[in-house]
Amino acid sequence: MEKTYNPTSIEQDLYKTWEEQGYFKPHGDTSKDAYSIMIPPPNVTGSLHMGHAFQDTIMDTLIRCQRMKGKNTLWQVGTDHAGIATQMVVERKIAAEEGKTKHDYGRDAFIDKIWEWKAESGGTITKQLRRLGASVDWDRERFTMDDGFYKAVQEVFVRLYKDDLIYRGKRLVNWDPKLHTAISDLEVENKETKGHMWHFRYPLADGVKTADGKDYIVVATTRPETMLGDTGVAVNPEDPRYKDLIGKEIILPIVGRRIPIVGDEHADMEKGTGCVKITPAHDFNDYEVGKRHQLPMINILTFDANIRDAAEVFNSNGEASNAYGTEIPAKYQGMERFAARKAIVAEFEELGLLQEIKDHDLTVPYGDRGGVVIEPMLTDQWYVRAGILAKPAVEAVENGDIQFVPKQYENMYFSWMRDIQDWCISRQLWWGHRIPAWYDEQGNVFVGRNEEEVRAENNIAADVALRQDDDVLDTWFSSALWTFGTLGWPEKTPELKVFHPTDVLVTGFDIIFFWVARMIMMTMHFCKDEDGKAQVPFKTVYVTGLIRDENGDKMSKSKGNVLDPIDMIDGIDLESLVAKRTGNMMQPQLAAKIEKNTRKTFENGIEAYGTDSLRFTLAAMASTGRDINWDMKRLEGYRNFCNKLWNASRYVLMNTEEQDCGFAAGAELEYSLADKWIESQFELAAKEFNGHIDNFRLDMAANTLYEFIWNQFCDWYLELTKPVLWKGTEAQQRATRRTLITVLEKTLRLAHPVIPYITETIWQSVKPLVDGVEGDTIMLQALPQYDVANFNQEALDDIEWVKAFITSIRNLRAEYDINPGKPLEVMLKAANEQDAARIEANKPVLVSLAKLESIRVLADGEATPACATALVGKSELMIPMAGLIDKDAELDRLAKEIAKTQGEIARIEGKLGNEGFVAKAPEAVITKEREKLAGYQEALVKLEQQKATIAAL
């Protein structure tokens, strides 16, 4: 092994070997249990971010554990075609490079252009996955536009349509006026902004008056432009001010339309004026009110969000209606929506109908891709009747067929699913799964897998023109089929039989509804087991938190706080990091601030930490369901952990290579107490690690590895072996060498799922030295399980006592500033015979590691000189202090330390006693100051105790 651990020199070559040797594939033995995970398909346009790295580390750890347990494991990888995102990338590319739009190309040629782009640039994220050590079966890589998956999508759509679970209807959707498509709620970014609330007077019709004698009511709105489409005003039926007006009408200003006053609890008596204008075609809440009261819907906006030349009028079911005229005042026709807002407010003012304007904090919806304000828009779209599909999906979680980890997310799932609305699945894009529906010239719709099937099933002659629907399916529709569509469904493939249902889905809470719930609905509707029972897509949903920056802020390009996992693996210099964070920004005005913060946070750029350090950090921070504040210091700490494992392994190899390790038949072996202890500690670690993995507590599993490797194996066991290897008998040395190499080999196997590269590299050097270990790779070795035969409680208890004894000596040396190399005379006032026996049995180790001149057990009642003392269990350890220290110099040193500590206490108490500081400082800063104060106060008590002890000498 190389003297120092250098991840750069081993990782990529090692991964290439793993992949070429086919170690990631299922072993295919169907007599063994199967285990499968489907990677949530990242967007093909994307690159690896910290969230991916986090979830992929979790999945790879789970998969490697199960593979090492002998299971037939499949971790299937793939990417999503990402409709809007991909289309925008290619549209921007042809605009920048060729000055063309998609319309210059035409649909088919533009789609060819996207396929070209995918071939050239679409594999970035899968290349990066390899850098993370992801042991996915690359031969089964899938894409949501693959021929096989396309066939599954078409099949699902056709069957749902024939089951009357898909229909085409006119409903309200999130409309992106820039991209000209409906978008999902997840693609809407709500931004807090300062705005206004306009209070308009709406005149009452037919001479009606309010309870206080006014001939108008006042409505409050943040969107004056939509009043052109008002079809009602809602008041609360319990509101004494207005309840007598229910059933009356108002004359809508500007357009002169008579519209009813309806009683509806949507109107809040305590909010605004208590009167709410209802615009069913341009507000989601109003749409529901309109349906309840069968109000007409008037669409006043074009797809560009300009005012139409003539309104569209529909009844509450979305059918064309003549309930109202379509006239829009000429001055507003074609006007941009926000210009219309100003003009309408001005006209209300001219008419004397603008009562007041109030400042108002608004939440405004923006499209996360197009970047413009989203409009609720009445459009013809395709919908899934989700309520019918949701019922069995709810029951699957209620009865435990699917479990959420942490369990609290079940409530989030239930709250969505029990109030589910029909799902809009069509998008006005070119890139995606085109909807398999055709129209004749009369507007009749025909659904089938292809045009030939449509003509055959419906007896449509070849000379009758058919036009395919221009829309494509929402990407969430196709990705809802991910667990079964990628395994060959609708064919009954062997893979589908073996690997479905999958075992675990690792995902974020933000897509429980958009993806997780829809996968459950679709899978249970289409996949049945041999007994005809609906299959679930996965047995467990492991919900992770978000990775945030060190301050707890969400990572985003606009904040300039994004960390690239690859930069932490390979390192990046400061100038490159600044350029990366400030380049291609949507808001270039933020660049200077981002540069300043980056230079402050990363003065020297980012070091290369290697993949294993990153993976271990991510695992160690994976507390289920909680958001994680990224901490570069922990990454540095776990890089040190990898170095510690490397150096410990070199020590083991230096003491075992070309040595007698006791594997020969009949070899005499005399195991030390420490040998038995480390075997027992390992068994406990294996038991804990497996339990934590089974419970999805990767943070605790990583902590178990850290505690065992760093604290037990490296810090204690290796030290405890030195007296044996230097001065022990041949039988003792043989046994210790055998223990060193076998425990290291088992430890490497236990740690491998979390830190695969370093463990494989070391294992290749260790393997030849351990009898009975065969195979070319550690990843196909057995994951260690608890073995009671190797567990010795007495050895555990005895070595814990030995550790406490040595630690107490070291602590006393530090407290009294005794030279760490000076041999000490130590006495023990033993509490029982067991402790006296422990001294006798372990004297060579105690003398060596605690650096003692002598050690003896005191007789009962024996007088002792002035000593420094410590408790070890129930016994008292004593170090005679005469001649060990310069009493006057030590008292002088302690006096200075005490004065310094008292000064710090006074300073912090003054700070915390300052009302201005406490009122203005963040809670975290105040907490930190209080913690510092407690630390200084504790230190002061110890210093004064030491001073008293030394003064008595």
Swiss-Prot record:
Motif 'KMSKS' region, chain ranges: 554-558
SUPFAM superfamilies for the chain: Anticodon-binding domain of a subclass of class I aminoacyl-tRNA synthetases (SSF47323), Nucleotidylyl transferase (SSF52374), tRNA-binding arm (SSF46589), ValRS/IleRS/LeuRS editing domain (SSF50677)
InterPro entries in UniProt: aa-tRNA-synth_I_CS, aa-tRNA-synth_Ia, Anticodon_Ia_Val, M/V/L/I-tRNA-synth_anticd-bd, Rossmann-like_a/b/a_fold, tRNA-bd_arm, tRNAsynth_Ia_anticodon-bd, Val-tRNA_synth_C_sf
Catalytic activity entry: tRNA(Val) + L-valine + ATP = L-valyl-tRNA(Val) + AMP + diphosphate
Enzyme class: ligase
Entry annotated with the keyword DNA-binding: no
Subcellular location: Cytoplasm
EC number(s) per entry: 6.1.1.9
Protein name: Valine--tRNA ligase
Native organism: Vibrio cholerae serotype O1 (strain ATCC 39315 / El Tor Inaba N16961)
